[in-house]
Structures are given as C-alpha cells and as structure tokens.
C-alpha cells in the first residue's frame, strides 16, 4: 500500500453512520411476546394459589453461623 494514499486530497472521504440504524426507536425496544396458556405449569399455579413461595422459605443452613460463639475482639470496631 502506498504511504501517500491516506494523504491524497483527491480521494473522497467516506463517512459511515454507525448509529443510523438506531434512528427508529422500535429497533432498540424488545419485542412483546405472546403468552400461551401452556406457559403456566403446575409449579406456577401452586405458588399463586396459596402454596409457599420460594422467597418465603427459610434456607436450611441460615442458622449455621449463629451456632458459633463470637470470640472476636470488637473493641477496635466500636
């Protein structure tokens, strides 16, 4: 490639609009999906009808760290 090729004043400048495709706001928005009745399984129905939500259940090991005595010196913290 000729080293003077970039400096040639006769060469037309090519500009590319990279954001031109995003001018229409519909292109960047997510498409709305249709919901079928088959999308709801028995697990979803169990939580809606009155079953225990997974967010209300306490993890089995939630009291694990509370079983240990605190043997740290907290005087430097307070």
UniProtKB/Swiss-Prot annotation:
GO BP: any one term: auxin-activated signaling pathway
Keyword terms, alphabetized: Auxin signaling pathway
Tissues where this protein is expressed: Expressed in siliques and anthers.
General function of this protein: Mediates responses to the synthetic auxin 2,4-dichlorophenoxyacetic acid (2,4-D). Not involved in the response to indole-3-acetic acid (IAA). May interact with RUB modification-related components and may regulate the culling-ring ubiquitin E3 ligase complex (CRL) activity.
Name of this chain's protein: Small acidic protein 2
The species this protein was found in: Arabidopsis thaliana
Gene: SMAP2
């Amino acid at each position: 490639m000729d080293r003077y090729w970039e400096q040639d004043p006769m060469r037309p400048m090519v500009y590319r609009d990279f954001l031109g495709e995003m001018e229409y706001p519909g292109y960047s928005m997510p498409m709305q999906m249709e919901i079928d009745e088959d999308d709801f399984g028995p697990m979803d129905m169990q939580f809606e009808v009155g079953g225990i939500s997974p967010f209300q259940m306490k993890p089995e090991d939630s009291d694990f760290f509370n079983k240990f005595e605190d043997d740290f010196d907290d005087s430097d913290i307070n």
